[in-house]
Amino acid sequence: MFTNPFGRKKDMSDDQKKNNQPDTEADNAENIKFAADDTELRAGDETDADFEMPEGFPEMDENMFGQVQEMMAKLERVDELEKENADLKNRLGRLASDFEGYRNRTTIESAEAHDKGVSKAAEALMPVYDDIDRALSLSVDDAAKLVPGMQAVQNKVLTIFGTLGLEATGREGEQFDPQWHEAIQVVAGDEDEKIVQTYQLGFKMGDRLVRPARVVVSRKG
């Protein structure tokens, strides 16, 4: 009988078979863990897209983003309107200041125009007063009848001048003042710079001369 030189391979025992077989349960558990880790990694790639905002915090979808942009545009427009409002206030302030200046100027000009009108009216009456004044100085036979009437007219004219704001100046006995008086003659006298005779009464309105008085002035010899 032929004998195998290598001998018959002895069958492995059950324990050896058991030890040499792969650990199926361990491998399966490892594979399951790997698959789970791989799933988590793939899920991590979608974190940004699938991230859930905390409860109560609105999602920033397209509609919300558009509303935010619209709100920002409105805020920018508010800033522009505030700047425009400030500019309009400045312009209004300048206009108010200009108007106040214009009103003051027109008030002054109106007052000056009124004074000039009064002066012209008074100047028109002055020759009448002068004629009356000269008539009163004439010596006539019926002076007793003429004088009272002429004096009444003269006083009436002076009253009218007073209502117009005119003040007579240059009467006899007043101190001579070159601002209001014009000396047409100088004569010797007991006092210097005294008006001894009035040829033509002068008139002034406040600080403004309407007509200088034409007078004769005394001077000590």
From Swiss-Prot:
Matches recorded under PROSITE patterns: GRPE
A Pfam entry, by short name: GrpE
Sample GO molecular function, one term: unfolded protein binding
Regions that span the bilayer: none
A single GO BP: protein folding
Principal location listed in the UniProt entry: cytoplasm
Location in or out of the cell: Cytoplasm
GO terms for cellular component: cytoplasm
Physiological role: Participates actively in the response to hyperosmotic and heat shock by preventing the aggregation of stress-denatured proteins, in association with DnaK and GrpE. It is the nucleotide exchange factor for DnaK and may function as a thermosensor. Unfolded proteins bind initially to DnaJ; upon interaction with the DnaJ-bound protein, DnaK hydrolyzes its bound ATP, resulting in the formation of a stable complex. GrpE releases ADP from DnaK; ATP binding to DnaK triggers the release of the substrate protein, thus completing the reaction cycle.
Protein family per UniProt: Belongs to the GrpE family.
Protein name from the UniProt record: Protein GrpE
Organism of provenance: Deinococcus radiodurans (strain ATCC 13939 / DSM 20539 / JCM 16871 / CCUG 27074 / LMG 4051 / NBRC 15346 / NCIMB 9279 / VKM B-1422 / R1)
Lineage of the species this protein comes from: Bacteria, Thermotogati, Deinococcota, Deinococci, Deinococcales
Gene that encodes it: grpE
